[in-house]
UniProtKB/Swiss-Prot annotation:
SUPFAM superfamilies: ITPase-like (SSF52972)
Superkingdom classification of source: Eukaryota
Chain positions recorded as ITP binding sites: 15-20, 55, 71-72, 88, 147-150, 168, 173-174
Pfam families assigned: Ham1p_like
Family in the record: Belongs to the HAM1 NTPase family.
Protein name: Inosine triphosphate pyrophosphatase
Reactions catalysed: ITP + H2O = IMP + diphosphate + H(+); dITP + H2O = dIMP + diphosphate + H(+); XTP + H2O = XMP + diphosphate + H(+)
Cofactor(s), names only, from the UniProt record: Mg(2+); Mn(2+)
Length: 191
């Protein structure tokens, strides 16, 4: 006799970034089924929380169902939190070397990687935010340069790019935020 199947949450993760999708699936599945849809959503300027809430509301309206969105910051302490939620544009314009050059005049190379996920059950449902933070420092690029700023963000002696994917998925800002999401979904399942 087979075990009864348990109901699983299904989330539609809104991203066009295959690396992010892979990490989210590796962390959440099989407990939460992750589907994917790439939508071109205009991002407002604001705090990370404002950007994530707005993106989540608009995605839920477009999809007409439950959505999961994510926004990431890389905050340089010497620059009072910049580039922050604008890291994507800084990275595209400056690259790894340019980001390092922003800190050339500063002794403080410390930084925070911040990930905020927004979940909405659908149109008209207020998004819920889940945030994870990892402290590290900015270093010259090490490791494969194929996932954003992973090659310049060092955590306990290794850049994210140098880490095994499974190891990174245990300690990263994204993993910490997703752990909070998983905890919330687990409570919802028993409610």
């Amino acid at each position: 006799m087979s075990a009864p199947s348990q109901a699983r949450h299904i989330v539609n993760f809104i991203t066009g970034n295959a690396n992010k999708l892979g990490e989210v699936k590796a962390i959440l599945e099989p407990a939460i089924q992750v589907e994917n849809q790439a939508l071109d959503l205009l991002e407002i300027q604001g705090t990370l929380e404002e950007v994530t809430l707005d993106k989540c509301r608009r995605a839920a309206d477009l999809v007409q169902g439950p959505v999961l969105v994510e926004d990431t910051c890389l905050c340089f302490n010497a620059l009072k939190g910049l580039p922050g939620p604008y890291i994507k544009w800084f990275m595209n314009s400056l690259g790894h070397e340019g980001l390092n050059n922003l800190l050339a005049a500063y002794e403080d190379k410390s930084a925070k990687a911040v990930c905020t996920f927004g979940y909405s059950a659908g149109p008209g449902h207020e998004p819920i935010l889940f945030q994870g933070i990892t402290d590290g420092k900015i270093v010259p690029p090490r490791g494969p340069p194929n996932f954003g700023w992973d090659a310049i963000f060092e955590y306990e002696g290794q850049t994210y790019a140098e880490m095994d994917k499974a190891e990174k998925n245990k300690i990263s800002h994204r993993a910490k935020a997703l752990a909070k999401l998983q905890e919330w979904f687990a409570k919802e399942m028993t409610a």
